[in-house]
């Protein structure tokens, strides 16, 4: 028998994911300041994707609330 689909804490888990992504974004931003141009470009591209993820996660949180 499959496990029941318990989504009662989805919003909380999503919020935690948002915070972790923000933390990673900030750490990467600090690292980029000390990196060479090639690495800095890669970090900036990844941070752009992180911003998109944060927007998506926040939208999901709204849907869950």
UniProtKB/Swiss-Prot annotation:
One of its GO terms (biological process) is asexual sporulation. Belongs to the Tlp family. Its main location: other. HAMAP family: Tlp. The keyword Secreted does not apply. It holds the Pfam family Tlp. This is Small, acid-soluble spore protein Tlp. Induction: Expressed only in the forespore compartment of sporulating cells. InterPro entries: SASP_thioredoxin-like. Disulfide bonds: none annotated. It is found in: Spore core. Keywords: Sporulation. It comes from Bacillus anthracis.
